[in-house]
Amino acid sequence: MTKIDFENIKILQDKIKDIEIEKNVYDERNIFLKNYLSPLYKELKEMSEEDKKEFGKQLNQYKEMIEDVAEKRINEIKKQKILNIKSEYDINLPADYFQSGGINPIDLVKNEIVKFFKKANFKILTESEVTSVEFNFDSLNIKKDHPARSISDTFYIDDKQLLRVHNTAITSKALRMFNKEEEIKVLSHGNVYRKDDDDATHSHQFNQIDMVWVKKGMSLANLKWLTDKLLKYLFNESIKIRYRISHFPFTEPSFEVDINCFFCDSKDHCSVCKNTKWIEVLGAGLLHPNVLKNANVKKGLSGIAFGIGIDRIAMLKYQIKDIRRLYGNDFSLIESFKGER
């Protein structure tokens, strides 16, 4: 088994130590990753399962060290910029005390999920909130007469453009973008829009995460493993998880995934789960063959996918009963998350 030379990170340190522009630091980091890390991933694919476990751990450690070196230099550049400003201006004049808030629960959950998938080497994508009918509907096997296409459900800009109704629109574009690769691992996040009346549990704008993982031999076992791992990471290891058969045009088979309700243990009536003892948290499934075909993905590959409403997860994790509080600049709510990251 190849031994990783952790000492060669000094090469990157020497390259970036005198750089004064943040973008140039990232450029040097990317070159280093291509020259030193990418070849190791190719070697990993050829190893036995036993060797892969140990070598994979070393690879992740190596990658984190590379990222840390780059981020350290970036922080030094930012700090120097502040010092330069201080030398030109007197920024120490007295000012009124401003009470600070904290990070919005939506961002807290999003950051948790992104961190989870970054560790699994997923590409993290965001796109314009305006997308095409093709990527939002056509390429995702959504029929012309599907109710979601109706102007009563979707915010159209013109005949060909709209505000995306799900982040699967980014996924469909990513599948086409990376269709020459043997493995595609993509996570997208951002706002989505639907013509819902705003109330305690609905909003015309909300945040969504969409995941797709394509490679040879992907199955329901992979989907269940990844979904279970994510939900236990977000909530706790003891939660119960249930899969129900459902239908989505872009997956086959499709499932809705529930977790056991942790609000109603001591209540006669639970307003969260309506006494069903279960709470729906995401939709998932195997990518429909037509979706892969429309993206010209290599033959012989299969994929798993799921979509998660970030707002819903935030409401469950932090026991927020009205979704409007997440968007209403409610300082008392945001202040309670001071110190969270």
From Swiss-Prot:
Enzyme Commission number(s) of this protein: 6.1.1.20
Gene Ontology CC annotations of this record: cytoplasm
Record note on cofactor: Binds 2 magnesium ions per tetramer.
Annotated localization: Cytoplasm
Catalytic activity annotation: tRNA(Phe) + L-phenylalanine + ATP = L-phenylalanyl-tRNA(Phe) + AMP + diphosphate + H(+)
Molecular function (Gene Ontology), one example: phenylalanine-tRNA ligase activity
InterPro entries: aa-tRNA-synth_II, aa-tRNA-synth_II/BPL/LPL, Phe-tRNA-synth_IIc_asu, Phe-tRNA_ligase_II_N, Phe_tRNA_ligase_alpha1_bac, Phenylalanyl-tRNA_Synthase, tRNA-bd_arm
Signal peptide: none
Residues involved in Mg(2+) binding: 252
Matches recorded under PROSITE patterns: AA_TRNA_LIGASE_II (PS50862)
Cofactor(s) recorded in Swiss-Prot or TrEMBL: Mg(2+)
Class of this enzyme: ligase
Pfam families in the cross-refs: Phe_tRNA-synt_N (PF02912), tRNA-synt_2d (PF01409)
Gene3D superfamilies reported for this sequence: Bira Bifunctional Protein, Domain 2 (3.30.930.10)
Major localisation: cytoplasm
Keyword Ligase belongs to the record: yes
A Gene Ontology biological process term: phenylalanyl-tRNA aminoacylation
Record bears the keyword Metal-binding: yes
Record keywords, A-Z: Aminoacyl-tRNA synthetase, ATP-binding, Cytoplasm, Ligase, Magnesium, Metal-binding, Nucleotide-binding, Protein biosynthesis
PANTHER family hit by this protein: PHENYLALANINE--TRNA LIGASE, MITOCHONDRIAL, PHENYLALANYL-TRNA SYNTHETASE
Family membership noted in the UniProt record: Belongs to the class-II aminoacyl-tRNA synthetase family. Phe-tRNA synthetase alpha subunit type 1 subfamily.
Record's subunit section: Tetramer of two alpha and two beta subunits.
Name recorded for this polypeptide: Phenylalanine--tRNA ligase alpha subunit
Gene name in the database record: pheS
